[in-house]
């Protein structure tokens, strides 16, 4: 590992899922937790080893979001499900690393597409280095993930290719938007399935494929992963409106202000046909999104000798910020946000229903807790 590499992140199943001694109390369950924790340490050490480039710029940019932390949701899921077989085999550890690196790569690209300013509590990569470098850093990470997967055999290569295709299609469909006659909410859920559900489903499938677990568990865990991924993203839509930036790592309403489509906004559009309050909220969202973009364009212009335009811009931005803070509060307190939370819980229940073919035991118990934590989280 390079001298400038970030320290290994300490991940714990007990900490991430709340699997304390009261919840997982039997000797078998405690051994299960310890085995997954050992696997997480191997994955983390491997991430530091794999995300390393001889080129200084490539090394700094690709390690940037790794060093910023992360929940390691996908490796945790792979390692949990691997306990249905032989546990953290070399193939399991490698696949978990590849999936997490793929996820990291997608974050670089997502932040460029969404013009996001913050990620994991730090300025986003394109804010630091610009769009071109951020995109290329993501490409390098995708390439490194593919290198790891190439050592796992033809089935793994095909799975990685299919997942990458779905990630791209999800981003494409999100960018283009629904076609005339499409249901915008159904379109949005399809986008979430491709952009988020596909990779979490891949992580779940890998837990069976590379652990020697019975192949009949592949379809149930794949469905679980896809549906819990949709639930995960819907809760992100709720978290975007949170007034606790210290927990979320970004300003309240980041997606809302950037004009990113979320389920609360889609629900507002649905209601606005007959509801004056929803229509008023939508108009205010559109006004602030347009004003924010206009202010950003003016701030990018060459400065003049006259300080008055800069002072006017700062004054306008201050007013916009105050208006927007009130708008976020109104959307957060509106029924559309609670409806989004309820929809996330529905997807989580469907995900758990898919696990019925799995045997009772610590794996199913941990996956149930995994689903609960996805919809209970605040960051």
Regions of interest found by a model, annotated:
Residues 1-379:
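All-alpha prenyltransferase/terpene-synthase fold signal
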């Amino acid at each position: 590992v390079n001298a400038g590499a970030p320290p290994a992140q300490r991940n714990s199943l007990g900490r991430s899922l709340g699997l304390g001694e009261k919840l997982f109390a039997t000797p078998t369950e405690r051994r299960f937790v310890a085995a997954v924790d050992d696997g997480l340490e191997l994955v983390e050490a491997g991430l530091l080893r794999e995300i390393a480039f001889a080129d200084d710029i490539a090394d700094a940019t690709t390690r940037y979001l790794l060093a910023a932390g992360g929940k390691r949701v996908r490796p945790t899921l792979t390692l949990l499900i691997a306990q249905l077989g032989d546990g953290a085999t070399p193939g399991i550890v490698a696949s978990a690393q590849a999936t997490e690196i793929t996820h990291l790569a997608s974050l670089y690209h997502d932040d460029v597409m969404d013009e996001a300013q913050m990620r994991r509590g730090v300025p986003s990569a394109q804010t630091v280095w610009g769009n071109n470098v951020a995109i290329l850093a993501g490409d390098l990470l995708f390439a490194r993930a593919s290198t790891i997967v190439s050592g796992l055999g033809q089935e793994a290569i095909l799975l990685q290719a299919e997942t990458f295709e779905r990630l791209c299609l999800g981003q494409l469909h999100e960018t283009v938007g629904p076609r005339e006659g499409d249901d915008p909410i159904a379109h949005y859920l399809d986008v979430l399935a491709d952009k988020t559900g596909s990779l979490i489903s891949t992580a779940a499938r890998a837990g069976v494929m590379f652990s020697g677990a019975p192949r009949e568990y592949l379809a149930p865990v794949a469905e679980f992963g896809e549906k819990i991924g949709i639930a995960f993203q819907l809760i992100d839509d709720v978290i975007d409106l949170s007034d606790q930036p210290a927990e979320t790592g970004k300003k309240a309403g980041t997606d809302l202000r950037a004009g990113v489509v979320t389920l609360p906004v889609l629900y507002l559009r649905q209601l606005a046909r007959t509801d004056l309050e929803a229509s008023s909220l939508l108009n205010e969202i559109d006004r602030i999104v347009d004003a924010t973009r206009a202010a950003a364009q003016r701030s990018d212009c060459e400065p003049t000798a006259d300080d008055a335009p800069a002072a006017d811009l700062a004054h306008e931005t201050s007013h916009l910020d105050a208006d927007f803070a009130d708008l976020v509060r109104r959307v957060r307190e509106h029924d559309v946000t609670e409806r989004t939370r309820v929809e996330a819980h529905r997807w989580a229940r469907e995900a758990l229903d898919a696990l019925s073919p799995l045997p009772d035991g610590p794996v199913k118990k941990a996956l149930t807790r995994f689903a609960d934590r996805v919809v209970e989280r605040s960051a």
